[in-house]
Amino acid sequence: MRERFDSEYIRSELERISDHLETPLTVYLIGGGSMSFRNLKETTKDVDLVVTDGDALQQLQVVLLDCGYEVIKDPSEEYHELSAQRILENADGCRIDVFNQKVVDKLVLSEGMCDRSVTHLEAGELTVALVSTEDVFLFKSVAGRTDDIDDMFTLVQTGLDFDIVEAELEQQIDLLGRELFVSYVNEALMSLDERHNITTPLFNPVSKITQRVYRELEVFHAFDDAIPRSCNSERGIASSNA
């Protein structure tokens, strides 16, 4: 079983990272680390950091390597699904997942998310911002890891503004140009209902979008399956007329 780390440890690691920075770097803390700093979670296995561009990604990786972190070259299937650009771990077993704008290959760190975030730590050249609890809830809903549903339940207890969550969901659809990721949100909301008997105001709009996604997928697959048969039929007619 992997080690878990509290907010004090995470803060000390972030401050250690700041000691190695020579130019400004802003990172956005999502997931369990963000919840830990808000006293919503005692410990977490991973520190999920989002940066806004490739230069910041490279800068953070270099600093983490300087701090003794090593790149995890063969993460478990659970981590493959996260689609982090970099996964690094230190000697204590603290793992940092680094994302460049896109998280879990399903959500983008949007302008609205950045605007809603709050600065939690400023140390040297490092600025650490916590994304809002509403946005953490949305990230958790697509992450697909074991503890995420329980974390979503904890977040609901804080009195989330689901108008914000729904508006961000619509914004993500516009940014990504597709709705498929909403089906993952739907699965998470169903699990939340089954495990904790909690139905959020997000359930109905997400369910409607998911039904539309499934209908479109059915049409696509039906069309895709029909193409070989159509081609074979045309070839048969051609040969019979020869």
Where are these predicted regions, by residue range?
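Compositionally biased terminal segments of proteins
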Residues: 1-242
